[in-house]
From Swiss-Prot:
Function: Transcription activation. Regulates the delayed-early 110 kDa promoter.
Organism of this sequence: Saimiriine herpesvirus 2 (strain 11) (SaHV-2)
Similarity comment: Belongs to the herpesviridae TAF50 family.
Gene (UniProt): 50
Protein name according to UniProt: Putative transcription activator BRLF1 homolog
Gene Ontology MF annotations: DNA binding
UniProt keyword terms in alphabetical order: Activator, DNA-binding, Early protein, Transcription, Transcription regulation
Bias type Basic residues, positions: 404-419
Region of interest (Disordered), ranges: 384-426
GO BP annotations, alphabetical order: regulation of DNA-templated transcription
Length: 535
């Protein structure tokens, strides 16, 4: 029996994958979605199947697929509208799961026109944007809570911190990690909502805390998110400049280049088109929380708190919806409402700073100040204008035979040697300059061995009297640690040579009253009482 070559088997398998109609979308991939109805999950499954079919047959209307995805995102936002105050957080998590599925199923296709569609090109950028948006909102929550006088319960703070740690870990690793561990991330989001519900039922959560969480997690602007994609369908060129690497050649992301580094978050750069992130004029937002009950009753998609109208007919005259005031999952009725009721509706917009241009120079602001920010300006164009690529360095004509310039300090340079410690530092401050060349002190104190060491037993002796006394026995310098230490200090600090140490055996010398402390070369008092009197 003749064996089939292995290369032929692999080639046949690749051809089967290349010409197959679509990749089977498993229904188990819809399990990570949070608080969505079964009907909504079935619509998402049909959308994924249609998206895979569009990757194989790109002749299909590309704008129709994009409109279906936008409609699905708006329907997800409508289903999460009643989950007050975590509507913004849960919307980000569910949109992250949806766009991660679009990105992952795009990578599974082996057909040639996979990356030619708009959704496949933008999928990874949307996933990255939502992930860094989660990092931005959670960081802002932990920073503004203590400055605003908000005390987060310990279980809720730990749950939010676990979500922040997971998101930051995904941002600092390889770009492939964005499409992994969807279930882990959605489980952390579900843990936050369940923890908040348990604390709210116990009466621990106040209305101020609930309003603060609602302001900390604004809803994402879905129309502005899809605006560059629709412009790309109409023929506009996509520009995705790399902000992290400002070199002439864009490096490929790998662990050695982008490991343990965090790039500039996209929410800081895309604020011009993404209006859900309104800059607070101060870190203390306690003024916004004067009437927290009114903030909780506001629509989470209200433009005053960074939202957007879900329906197009509500753009001109937004109507107040009463469905959000009675949430079905998270109830804030048991919250403490003993707070001053001051109306903050007229001053709500004034507490936010005006339009902010992050990371822009004065020249860029001056050049773009007269240009109206209309809806025709695409997001990549704004990013490319505000963050131009680094100018390439001009090549220099250097002769390869020319020796290279040596690095470091050249020989014979006039650099001063670091001064060493001189004996003048041990002299008194009132000694004249002419006396600083003294080689050794005139008097040294000695203490008898059979008496206590106090100020009355200190016996000074001169160098001349020590040599004239016949009863003095010299000590071997090689056998004492003091002489060894004195020699080391002399070498290190360029000190004068110490005098010969001698011991007194059964000799009682009278105290010389003529000895002055300045003769010893010391500037500090000799006894504790003198030290106290000096102080």
């Amino acid at each position: 029996m003749q064996r089939i070559p292995l290369w032929l088997v692999r080639s046949t398998h690749c051809l089967i994958l290349l010409f197959q109609d679509d990749v089977q979308v498993r229904k188990s991939c819809l399990e990570p979605f949070l608080f969505l109805s079964p009907e909504r999950k079935r619509e998402i499954h049909q959308l994924l199947v249609a998206f895979n079919q569009s990757l194989v047959t790109p002749t299909q209307d590309e704008e129709k697929i994009l409109s279906d995805i936008q409609r699905a995102c708006l329907q997800i936002a409508e289903d999460l509208k009643h989950l007050n105050p975590f509507t913004g957080l849960l919307l980000d998590l569910n949109l992250y799961t949806l766009w991660t599925l679009l990105r992952n199923y795009k990578t599974k296709q082996r057909s040639q026109p996979v990356n030619s569609t708009v959704v496949s090109r933008y999928a990874h950028h949307v996933v990255k944007y939502i992930m860094q948006r989660l990092v931005y909102t959670t960081d802002r929550l932990f920073l503004t809570a203590p400055t605003s006088g908000i005390v987060l319960p310990v279980p809720l703070a730990n749950a939010i911190f676990n979500l922040l740690s997971h998101c930051r870990k995904k941002c600092t690793g390889l770009w492939r990690n964005y499409g992994t561990e969807k279930s882990v991330l959605m489980g952390l989001g579900k843990e936050i909502t369940l923890c908040y519900q348990a604390l709210n039922e116990s009466g621990i959560v106040s209305t101020t805390l609930a309003a603060f969480i609602k302001l900390s997690f604004p809803t994402i602007s879905i129309p502005n998110l899809f605006k560059p994609m629709f412009q790309s369908c109409k023929g506009n060129q996509d520009n995705f400049p790399d902000i992290c690497t400002q070199g002439s050649v864009i490096r490929r992301p790998h662990q050695g280049v982008f490991g343990d580094t965090f790039p500039i978050p996209d929410p800081l750069m895309r604020e011009i088109s993404e209006n859900s992130f309104k800059k607070f004029s101060t870190a203390n937002i306690s003024t916004l929380l004067q009437n927290p009950k009114e903030i909780l009753e506001m629509d989470p998609f209200d433009p005053r708190i960074g939202g957007f109208p879900l329906n197009k007919e509500e753009t001109a005259t937004p109507l107040k919806d009463s469905s959000f005031s009675n949430p079905t999952f998270i109830n804030t009725g048991a919250a403490n409402t003993l707070l001053p009721a001051a109306s903050v509706t007229p001053a709500l917009e004034s507490l936010f700073s005006p339009t902010h241009f992050p990371c822009m120079s004065d020249e860029s602001i001056a050049s773009t100040s007269h240009v109206p920010l209309d809806n025709n300006i695409s997001l990549p164009t704004l990013v490319k204008t505000n963050f131009p690529l680094k100018r390439k360095r001009q090549s220099r004509n250097i002769d390869p035979n020319t020796p290279r310039r040596p690095r470091g300090r050249p020989k014979g340079s006039k650099t001063k040697k670091r001064p060493t410690c001189s004996p003048a530092l041990f002299q008194s401050s009132d000694i004249p300059t002419d006396s600083l060349h003294v080689k050794c002190p005139e008097m040294l104190p000695t203490v008898p061995q059979n008496e206590f060491c106090d100020s009355s037993n200190i016996q000074p002796c001169t160098s001349s009297s020590v040599l004239e006394n016949d009863n003095l026995v010299p000590i071997n310098e090689a056998e004492t640690d003091d002489n060894i230490l004195a020699t080391i200090l002399q070498d290190l600090y360029d000190l004068p040579a110490p005098p010969v140490l001698c011991s007194h055996e059964n000799q009682t010398l009278e105290i010389d009253n003529n000895v002055d402390i300045e003769d010893l070369g010391l500037s500090f008092p000799m006894s504790l009482q003198d030290f106290l009197n000096d102080e």
